[in-house]
Design a protein with these regions (language model features):
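Cytoplasmic helix-loop-helix junction between adjacent transmembrane helices
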Residues: 119-156
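Helix-breaking motifs and short loop linkers at transmembrane-helix boundaries and internal kinks
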Residues: 55, 87, 108-113, 143-144
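Central cavity-lining transmembrane alpha-helices of secondary-active solute carriers
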Residues: 66-81
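Extracytoplasmic
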Residues: 21-61, 75-79, 166
Length: 230
């Protein structure tokens, strides 16, 4: 009897919302991908400050950025495997933890190999964990109707993250220095972690729901008439 009671409790959404729970899942995934893209692109803004403080050449710094981009791409298949095995929620949290560790290491670094490790490798892998594979998985698991809208929102997260974070990071560096600017990136990621832990779910069935529009026949024809309310 106790097992039945526990299962029943787990089938309820953690929040009572006036709209379909999948839109909250999309929002969390969007914010995570946006933050990841912003952090991943931030080293471009660090080139001049690092040159001035450590005397590293532009080519040397660019080599770490290139490694970051390489691992971001290589991490895609790894991310897909981990999502299949552990679910989007754990992969999102693990990726954010890697980003937090990488940016935190930046604040204490004194040598180039440390910069290469934290930004080139750790941040590159962390950002790759929440790329297009994650957004496609979330969109397809949670939506039948409005799937195109959900995927479109998630697909815009990467470019939006760069659009928001780069000017913000540049302003923080100009007013407070690059270390304080890096700390703001950590704060943003730390805010997201408990939200994902509490409210992110891997699949609609985990909270007793079906994918949005799954109960409609001819979901493709009726998707345009479906509202945001589930």
């Amino acid at each position: 009897m106790q097992n039945i009671s526990s299962d029943t409790i787990q089938k309820h959404p953690p929040l009572s919302l006036p709209f379909y729970y999948g839109w909250l899942v999309v929002s969390l995934c969007f914010l995570t991908t946006l933050t990841s893209a912003g952090v991943r692109s931030s080293p471009q803004v660090l080139i001049l400050p690092l040159q001035d403080e450590f005397g590293w050449s532009r080519a040397l710094i660019a080599s770490a950025i290139s490694m970051n981009l390489l691992l971001f791409g290589v991490a895609g298949p790894i991310s897909g495997y981990l999502i299949d095995r552990f679910g989007p929620r754990k992969v999102m949290m693990g990726s954010l933890l890697l980003l937090i560790c990488g940016v935190s290491g930046t604040i204490a670094m004194t040598q180039f190999w440390q910069f290469f490790l934290v930004w080139g490798i750790i941040v590159g892998l962390g950002a790759g964990g929440v790329g297009s594979v994650l957004t496609a998985t979330v969109g397809n698991r949670w939506f039948v109707a409005r799937r195109g809208l959900a995927l479109g929102i998630l697909g815009s997260a990467s470019s939006t993250g760069q659009l928001i974070f780069l000017p913000f990071f540049m302003a923080m560096i100009a007013y407070s220095g690059w270390r304080i600017g890096s700390m703001t990136l950590i704060v943003v990621a730390l805010i997201l972690l408990p939200l994902i832990f509490l409210f992110m779910r891997d699949d609609p069935a985990d909270i007793g729901l079906e994918p949005y529009g799954a109960d409609q026949t001819g979901a493709g024809g009726s998707a345009g008439a479906a509202s945001l309310r589930g």
